[in-house]
A protein has these predicted regions:
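Short Pro-Gly-centered flexible turn/kink motifs
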Residues: 101-106, 283-302, 737-745
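Aromatic-lined carbohydrate-binding/catalytic grooves of carbohydrate-active enzymes
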Residues: 325-461, 475
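Glycan-recognition surfaces
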Residues: 419-458, 502-609
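C-terminal beta-sandwich/jelly-roll accessory domains of carbohydrate-active enzymes
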Residues: 671-748
Length: 748
């Protein structure tokens, strides 16, 4: 059993392979958080929190005559509001009189096999009985509000998931102005916060800063998890590295506006509260109604950032991603967007596909512009019927020609949006989110459809399902190209307008559920102007997400590096694009572009017909190499060997099979130097006592100052310990952005 309860001491212990999570019901019935970290044995953990009378930290009423028991000082599992804890709260609730307050006490608990599920929200699932569930029931007597704290314990994964379920068992309505998913109080000490900020075309840039005495907030108010901050953070010891130091991860399974707050208290405790963004949130909870919060995924690693990342990678691959595509190699695709933009017809697309097929590409994806009057981004969104001027005869003649080449066919959609210049908007202007009496802000010339309305979800499900039923479409790229503003729904009364942004997200999830369950063999790829909705919530429906609209290989190094802290490479959409690059104007060798894109789903986004003969040969070889290495890249352990933001010379990363049978080292020189220092690297994830052969050395885009006779060469053999601790030195690399791939195979 991974969940134990000591009824005498009233202590819960959740255990995974390498961690312990301890909670205690105190004398007043409050659920206290005692410990989360490396596995420990028995012992009185309340001694960590001795009774102390601190000025201006009020005591519970029961302790008013012998002070020192204050909610402001105790570590708590889920905090109420306005009852004496002045740190971050999980909940703000008002009763029908306008009185704010909640103080939850223990009622009962149950332990169940398997994993809890949430109503209308994506969450982790159990595989082969690899999870247990703890439900702790608590009650606020004054309001009749019941709180169920949900814990999913994945023992072998070293993961604990959490969510909260709130039910109004009182006689009058309540209003939730804040409803966080989880609170985590961490022990005394100095901590660093790692978070992943950015902007469009420059997502998930790692930033590391000390946890101070202020409140540090990572959030989005944009209606999506956003390009600007990712709903994932790490708290680690200040001296933690990739291979040492205690590290805690907190990841939300949510794709809408969210908020993750970190606060260091007056006594040095650090509290993390994660949940739905409280700005513009107000949920009415009538008697008998229940509200589920989004899920949070917690993980702890005692030995650095790399094992923490690997725990998340395995968990997301196994217990977040679903459907037949999660464990399969994805087809190598070509997308026409950067080759044609809106200017295409059947002949152009077939010509691109013919060249791609001759080089080994497996799928042709038709991007934006195939529907309605969509000749630019001012019109057509919402009208999911084929533009027969561009595609005479519709989609079927094009698909038949693509399939005749031995290729699959995929299609771009953006179901959540509408143009004012569209038949859908002219028919249903009330289906767009706009404020009464105001001209709305426009993003990419489009408005957001009101997916809080079931009839809008039904329309979209019907229109997209019709496309998938009537045409042989094997891939869908689901885009979302603006942030939400002017949020107001004409389907709900004034008192429910604070529910709309969350109801919108529930509508998106309902639509994604209907489409992915209705067409399980279709490969869905998420997108939101690139990586604007790259989160665990969307990964429950799509096994891959377009990582960024920035396809520049050198820029992608920092984007994919930051993404890798929480998300596996098999979820990162990555393509080889044209040069000069359309976002930066940079020219990079085509093989270096491929080395970077291979650490993702791998595909192409350019007109292959414009390549030179040598580049076409390179593309053929890239595809063969990717297919050969894909199992290792997709399922192997990922290691960050350098930080591209700190190492101006080169960026290196590595994959190793979990059983240590093979490894792949990748390196890109980002700033070639005269008379450079040696490139010295040690491998990771190998078996010390094994023997490995260097059976693949590929240098791309480089020029050598001279031959190195005594350097590394193909066929050399090394012990695992030599590669792990002595390492290898690579030859000097010159030219513009050269790259290297080294492959090792275990031979004994």
């Amino acid at each position: 059993m991974s969940i134990r309860f000591d009824s005498e001491a009233r202590i819960f212990v959740l255990e995974t392979a390498h961690t312990s999570y301890h909670m205690k019901v105190d004398a007043l019935g409050h659920l206290l958080h005692l410990y989360y970290g490396k596995t420990i044995g028995t012992g009185d953990l309340m001694q960590l929190y001795p009774r102390t009378d601190r000025g201006f930290s009020p005591d519970y009423y029961a302790y008013r005559t012998h002070r020192g028991v204050s909610p402001d000082l105790l570590p708590q599992e889920y905090t109420g509001c306005n009852v004496g804890d002045f740190r971050l709260s999980c909940l703000t609730v008002a009763d029908s009189r306008g009185a704010f307050g909640a103080d939850f006490t223990y009622v009962s608990h149950t332990v169940e096999a398997g994993k809890y599920q949430l109503t209308g929200l994506p969450c982790a699932h159990a595989e082969e009985n690899d999870a247990e569930t703890l439900i702790v029931r608590m009650q606020d007597e004054a309001t009749g509000l019941t709180l169920e704290l949900l814990y999913g314990v994945f023992a072998q994964q070293d993961v604990i998931t959490r969510a909260a379920r709130l039910t109004n068992h009182g006689d009058t309505p309540l209003r939730l102005d804040k409803a966080a998913s989880a609170c985590l109080d961490l022990p005394f000490g100095r901590w660093d916060l790692l978070h992943f900020h950015g902007r469009h075309a420059m997502e998930r840039q790692l930033e590391r800063e000390a946890v101070g005495t202020n409140i540090q907030t990572i959030s989005s108010v944009r209606g999506s998890s956003s390009h600007h901050n990712n709903p994932f953070l790490i708290l680690c010891q200040q001296d933690a590295t990739e291979t040492s130091g205690a590290c805690y991860g907190v990841m939300m399974v949510y794709s809408g506006s969210y908020q993750m707050d970190v606060e260091r208290s007056q006594t040095g405790l650090v509290r993390v509260v994660s949940g739905i963004q409280e700005e513009r949130f107000a949920w009415n909870l009538k008697p008998g109604e229940t509200f589920d919060t989004p899920e949070v995924i917690l993980s702890f690693a005692a030995e650095g950032l790399t094992p923490l990342s690997q725990q998340y990678h395995r968990f997301l691959r196994r217990n977040i991603c679903r459907g037949p595509w999660r464990g399969k190699r994805r087809p190598v695709l070509i997308n026409n967007w950067e080759a044609t933009y809106f200017d295409f017809n059947t002949e152009k697309i077939v010509k691109i596909a013919e060249k791609a097929a001759s080089l080994g590409v497996e799928m042709m994806v038709l991007d934006d512009g195939w529907f309605g009057t969509r000749n630019d981004d001012n019109q057509g969104l919402g009208d999911w019927v084929v533009n027969c001027e561009k595609l005479p005869g519709g989609l079927d003649p094009l698909i038949e020609q693509i399939n005749a080449l031995g290729m699959k066919f995929g299609l771009w959609i953006e179901p959540e949006m509408v143009n004012e210049n569209s038949q859908l908007y002219r028919t249903h202007p009330d289906w767009a989110l706009t404020l009464p009496g105001r001209k709305p802000a426009m993003g990419r010339n489009q408005l957001v459809l009101d997916l809080s309305r079931p009839e809008v979800v039904d329309y979209l499900a019907g229109a997209i399902s019709k496309l998938l039923r009537e045409h042989h479409i094997e891939y869908i790229k689901w885009d979302m190209n603006r942030s939400m503003s002017d949020v107001y729904s004409r389907a709900f009364p004034a008192e429910q307008q604070g529910e709309i942004m969350h109801r919108y997200m529930l509508g998106v999830y309902a639509l994604a559920e209907r489409l992915t369950q209705g067409f399980p063999e279709v490969l869905f790829e998420g997108c939101a102007g690139g990586g604007g909705r790259f989160d665990a919530g969307m990964l429950c429906y799509y096994p891959q997400i377009w990582c960024s609209d920035d396809t520049d290989a050198i820029e992608r190094l920092t984007i994919q590096h930051g993404t890798s802290f929480g998300y596996p490479v098999c979820t990162m959409g990555a393509h080889v694009s044209a040069c000069p690059n359309h976002q930066t104007g940079r020219t990079t060798p085509i093989d270096t572009r491929a080395v970077v894109a291979m650490s993702g789903t791998f595909g192409y986004e350019l007109d292959l017909g414009k390549l030179k003969r040598a580049e076409c040969t390179a593309v053929k070889n890239q595809i063969k190499r990717f297919k050969r290495l894909n199992d290792l890249i997709r399922t192997g352990d990922y290691y960050r060997l350098t930080d591209p933001a700190e190492n101006a010379y080169f960026t290196a990363w590595q994959f190793a099979a979990e059983d240590g049978s093979e490894a792949l080292l990748n390196l890109v020189v980002t700033h070639p130097q005269a008379n450079p220092l040696p490139i010295h690297l040690c491998f990771r994830g190998l078996k010390e006592d094994a023997v490995y052969e260097l059976d693949g050395i590929d240098y791309f885009g480089s020029r050598y100052a001279h031959d190195v006779e005594d350097g590394i060469h193909k066929g050399m053999r090394f012990s695992g310990s030599t590669l792990l601790y002595a390492g290898l030195v690579l030859p000097q690399l010159f030219g513009d952005y050269p790259s290297v791939q080294l492959h090792l195979t275990r031979k004994g």
